[in-house]
């Protein structure tokens, strides 16, 4: 049986696991601590698919009718 890839679904926005360096750069750019970011659970299907671990930061790119693309960041929690 073929395994279903969550990210291949048209309604799921692109999720990118940031490296520690990229994550630190994002936090410095916005002047926030990781704990202040919106959260995503480590058990979320996309988080599991991309191999995210607790404490990682995920960049989410969503298509937007007005801005063409919106970028969000999520902290992976337990």
From Swiss-Prot:
GO terms (molecular function) for this protein are: DNA binding; DNA-directed RNA polymerase activity
**Protein known as:** DNA-directed RNA polymerase subunit Rpo5
The text of the family note is:
Belongs to the archaeal Rpo5/eukaryotic RPB5 RNA polymerase subunit family.
User: What GO CC annotations are associated with the protein?
Assistant: cytoplasm; DNA-directed RNA polymerase complex
Reactions catalysed, as given in the entry: RNA(n) + a ribonucleoside 5'-triphosphate = RNA(n+1) + diphosphate
Query: Which Gene3D superfamilies does its entry note?
Result: RPB5-like RNA polymerase subunit
**Which Enzyme Commission numbers does its entry carry?**
2.7.7.6
Name the HAMAP family for this protein: RNApol_Rpo5_RPB5
Q: What does this protein do?
A: DNA-dependent RNA polymerase (RNAP) catalyzes the transcription of DNA into RNA using the four ribonucleoside triphosphates as substrates.
List localization entries.
Cytoplasm
Q: Domain of life of the organism in this record?
A: Archaea
Per UniProt, the keywords (alphabetical) are: Cytoplasm, DNA-directed RNA polymerase, Nucleotidyltransferase, Transcription, Transferase
Query: What biological-process GO terms show up in the record?
Result: transcription by RNA polymerase II; transcription elongation by RNA polymerase I; tRNA transcription by RNA polymerase III
Give the quaternary structure. Answer: Part of the RNA polymerase complex.
Main localization of the protein described in the UniProt heading: cytoplasm
What Pfam family is a match, any one?
Answer: RNA_pol_Rpb5_C
């Amino acid at each position: 049986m073929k395994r279903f890839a969550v990210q291949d679904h048209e309604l799921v926005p692109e999720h990118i696991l940031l490296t520690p360096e990229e994550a630190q750069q994002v936090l410095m750019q916005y002047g926030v601590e990781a704990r202040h970011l919106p959260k995503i659970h480590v058990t979320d299907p996309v988080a599991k698919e991309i191999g995210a671990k607790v404490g990682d930061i995920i960049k989410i790119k969503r298509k937007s009718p007005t801005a063409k693309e919106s970028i969000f960041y999520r902290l992976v929690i337990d």
